[in-house]
Amino acid sequence: GSEMCIRDRTNEDHVTYFMSNANALTYLTDVIDNINYWSNYILTEWTGSYKDSFKSNSTSESNAQGSSISNLVNGLCYHYESIIRKGKIGLPLGAFNGFSQQIEPDLVECYYHQESLPFVIESVNAMKKYINGISFNSSENGLGLDNYMTHVGAMQNSNSLSSVINSQIDEIIEKVGQLNDPLS
């Protein structure tokens, strides 16, 4: 099945592959159905009563464990630590593989495509956009976690925490951009 992902294929080659391989088509359809289900579920929850529940559990005095803000920040940290840092970089490089520290290049994202770094950079950029309240289809800085940090006066040393985080993310993107693909 890996022949489908090789980067020299055209769009038509990909369509032909899925249309002529029942298992691949089933997998693709299942992925699309899953994305559609969860997108609609989240939209329904946020346009329903969950938005009010989230807000009522998110006052500046209520950032303790179990609060909406705490859960949001912990989820963001998990995403960065486990999905991006560990999953996309650390495991393939052997940094998180127990005592062996064995390099496992086959664990990189898009192994057969031979380009995984653009996906690492895009993941980090998406995280930055999320923090700064930037929609996936806009470059406008809307209300985000950065505004909450400013509202509660979150600081590291004498710098605003949101500025420190954004600077660190920019540095991560710069450093990842200095790596060479393929990581595999």
Residue map of PLM features:
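Short, small-residue-biased leader/transition segments that mark boundaries at the very start
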Residues: 1-6
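An amphipathic alpha-helical core segment
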Residues: 18-28, 40, 45, 51-53, ...
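A surface/extracellular/periplasmic glyco- and lipid-processing/surface-interacting theme
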Residues: 10-86, 90
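Flexible, glycine-rich surface segments
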Residues: 54-158
